[in-house]
Amino acid sequence: NIIIRLDGYYAPFTTDAFLSAIERGFYNGLNFHRVVPNFVVQGGDPRGDGWGGPGYTLLTERSPIEFNCGAVGMVRTEYDTEGSQFFITLTDQPQLNYQYTRFGEVICGMDVVKRLEAGDRILAISVVTMDER
């Protein structure tokens, strides 16, 4: 399992959209289509090739929190083009700071993240409150 703490303070719209997609089951069964060693794993694309999305875009919500190892951010082609694709950093990535929406961090299961390979599937994502952990 991978447990991600979401940041609704610095990325409220992204967090809301991510939670809404989870509630709809959007991510269940999707794959991690891109794995770049020592950089990121990327998933959340319904097409599975890096070109798909949810049919809407989100505004870029740049935060002052750094992209350290385990940071969760939104994929974009340019500002304000985020959708459903997200990435998890495998190492510290300071060049991403203030450039991408960082909306969460892995708090448990980073060993699992580091073993992911392209094509591995998201079996299911569920929302757990901190009280339920």
Predicted regions and their residues:
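Cyclophilin-like peptidyl-prolyl cis-trans isomerases
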Residues: 1-133
